[in-house]
A protein has these predicted regions:
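C-terminal catalytic "cap/lid" subdomain
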Residues: 1-245
Length: 245
């Protein structure tokens, strides 16, 4: 994710913003070695196998395998992100005016071993939760989770579906969104709003500017409101100064 997709995003941003410095980084994300999620694997990774192949790999390599459609795949734990190791470097690049692409796929999971050294582990970190942690540490003005739907809906997938334009963390969590799709996005924006008191939003990629203006997406704030949309403008970098994340 960080290599191939990072390269695609890097090139697209360079073509869209000629003259602007763009950096794509490989990041490590710190997790707790004792996180209970590591003992309860849920995330599919790697290739697909037949049942016999999967059982043989489970026996020889100690993997946990589960059915995935007609085949079997390995599953690993998804521990909660604590912080992105390279946060200071990301901040330095942002202060220099660069556009930074980072924490793809949630980052490479690492722990601190008994000697205090970083050590990689086999796990998958939720990318939305990592984005929330990084945004908080960078003191970002807002967290936008951009996807392929207009926002968060009640009764999604039914004739009664209705988009939610404004919400608080409490009202959004009460919807109990599916754990494998919208759930992590909702939890990420709720955590960011609760910890910072700032705005977060979920919406369509092409609506990013309108979301900042308050006219699109689902916007989450502590009080469930976001100023007067007509008076809001996308944040601009100060003349001669750094651009906020």
């Amino acid at each position: 994710t960080q290599g191939m997709i990072g390269y695609w995003l890097l090139q697209a941003m360079q073509n869209a913003l000629p003259g602007r410095q763009v950096a794509s980084m490989v990041n490590q994300t710190l997790v707790l070695a004792g996180d209970p999620a590591l003992e309860h694997p849920t995330k599919f990774v790697g290739e697909v196998y037949t049942r016999d192949e999967a059982q043989a790999l489970a026996a020889t390599r100690g993997w946990t395998v589960r059915p995935d459609g007609e085949h079997y795949r390995r599953v690993v734990g998804s521990p909660a992100p604590q912080r992105v190791i390279e946060t200071r470097l990301v901040r330095t690049l942002l202060q220099a005016g660069a556009v930074v692409i980072c924490a793809g796929g949630g980052g490479v999971p690492v722990i601190r071993n008994t000697h205090g050294k970083l050590q990689g582990i086999e796990a998958v970190i939720d990318k939305d939760l990592t984005a929330a942690v990084l945004a908080e540490d960078l003191e970002a003005d807002a967290l936008l989770i951009l996807t392929d739907v207009n926002g968060v809906y009640t009764h999604y997938g039914t004739p009664h579906a209705k988009q939610i334009p404004r919400a608080t963390p409490t009202t959004l969590r009460a919807l109990n969104p599916p754990a494998g799709s919208m759930g992590p996005k909702v939890e990420a924006v709720c955590r960011f709003v609760e910890l910072t008191g700032d705005m977060a939003a979920i919406g369509r990629l092409h609506d990013a500017t309108r979301i900042i203006q308050g006219t699109a997406g689902t916007i989450i704030t502590p009080g469930g409101s976001y100023g007067q949309p007509n008076d809001l403008q996308p944040p601009q970098p100060a003349a001669g100064g750094p651009e906020r994340a």
